[in-house]
Curated annotation (Swiss-Prot):
Statement: the UniProt record of this protein carries the keyword ATP-binding: yes
CDD domains documented for this protein: PRTases_typeI
Gene Ontology biological process terms in this record: 5-phosphoribose 1-diphosphate biosynthetic process; purine nucleotide biosynthetic process; ribonucleoside monophosphate biosynthetic process
Broadest EC class assigned to this enzyme: transferase
Organism the protein comes from: Granulibacter bethesdensis (strain ATCC BAA-1260 / CGDNIH1)
Catalytic activity annotation: D-ribose 5-phosphate + ATP = 5-phospho-alpha-D-ribose 1-diphosphate + AMP + H(+)
Name the record gives this protein: Ribose-phosphate pyrophosphokinase
Manner of cofactor binding, per the entry note: Binds 2 Mg(2+) ions per subunit.
Top-rank lineage group of the source organism: Bacteria
Coiled-coil zones: none
Pathway involvement of the protein, from the record: Metabolic intermediate biosynthesis; 5-phospho-alpha-D-ribose 1-diphosphate biosynthesis; 5-phospho-alpha-D-ribose 1-diphosphate from D-ribose 5-phosphate (route I): step 1/1
E.C. numbers: 2.7.6.1
Length: 310
């Protein structure tokens, strides 16, 4: 097995390599004066089982091109199999037509990754599970649920907790954690009664006096989760915390979270933390490196990945 790290999240790639007791394959990603990307693999990969680690997070287009060009370099270098390890799959929120004459960008990205030379994909908490069907190659979608459930059990031991989905679409994700913890599930139903009227958040479930934990896959601007936390507190919750897999946290998200009722937001290191995230008092990271490493080992050994979540 060989591991190639692109530039979007090198610390995560190094942690994965360390967990597998393997060195990173020597490779370089450079940019010409006009910002074209040039990738060079400095070791022989002929006949090797190669894993390329690259999140397609901000800047999404640059990181996507790095991944595509690296895949092409490995394919042309006669690697036996190339797995694109994409902890955060950018463009996943564009998984359907949002209106007339609009693209399905997630499908386009899937096509590009396949055509560039990937033989399989390993990713984490896809925004929409059906994206796996956009690929004509195998896709292993890992879940943060076991990691989050263990952390919640440790941090909230002995407290009266309730798992909360911030919207109807996230119920299955939240229920998976509630089931692991044998606790109750609440749902926030967002409704706009008529045009021009502010969105109303209705809490379905009795959260009075309970420590509520919101579960989501992506936190971008933070607006939805901050509003959801405020709704929980307004309905009598003792506290509101958040667990979300992918901390995109764009723009003023960190400042928005800091001034919100969210007592603590827990994210994973699927996306490289910005300085604002590292300095934030109420944002913390859990590493997914051991989970990725074990999944990669199983793929290389041709053993079951799904049994990680049994």
């Amino acid at each position: 097995m060989k591991i190639v790290a692109c530039n979007s999240n090198r610390p995560l790639a190094e942690a994965v390599a360390a967990a597998l007791n393997l060195p990173l394959t020597k490779a370089s990603v450079r940019r010409f004066a006009d910002m074209e990307v040039f990738v060079e693999i400095h070791e022989n990969v002929r006949g090797e089982d190669v894993f390329v680690i690259q999140s397609t997070s901000y800047p999404a287009n640059d990181n996507l091109m790095e991944l595509l060009i690296t895949l092409d370099a490995l394919r042309r270098g006669s690697a036996r199999r190339v797995t694109a390890v994409i902890p955060y799959f950018g463009y996943a929120r564009q998984d359907r037509k949002s209106g007339p004459r609009t693209p399905i960008s997630a499908k386009l990205v899937a096509n590009l990754i396949t055509e560039a030379g990937a033989n399989r994909v390993l990713t984490m908490d896809l925004h929409a599970g059906q994206i796996q069907g956009f690929f004509d190659i195998p896709v292993d979608n890992l879940y943060a649920a076991p990691l989050f459930a263990r952390d919640i059990a440790e941090r909230f031991h002995g407290r009266d907790i309730m798992i909360v989905s911030p919207d109807v679409g996230g119920v299955l994700r939240a229920r998976a954690i509630a089931t692991r913890l044998n606790t109750d599930l609440a749902i926030i139903d967002k409704r706009r009664e008529r045009a021009g009227v502010s969105e109303v958040m209705n809490v379905i479930g009795d959260v009075e006096g309970r420590d509520c934990i919101l579960i989501d896959d992506i936190c971008d601007s933070g607006g939805t989760l901050c509003n959801a936390a405020a709704a929980l507190i307004a309905n009598g919750a003792a506290s509101a915390s958040v667990y979300t897999t992918h901390g995109v946290l764009s723009g003023g998200a960190v400042a928005r979270i800091a001034s919100s009722p969210i007592s603590m937001m827990t994210i994973t290191d699927s996306i490289l933390a910005t300085e604002a995230v590292r300095l934030a008092q109420n944002v913390r990271q859990l590493t997914i490196a051991p989970l990725l490493a074990e999944a990669m080992r199983r793929i290389s050994d041709e053993s079951s990945v799904s049994s990680l979540f049994d």
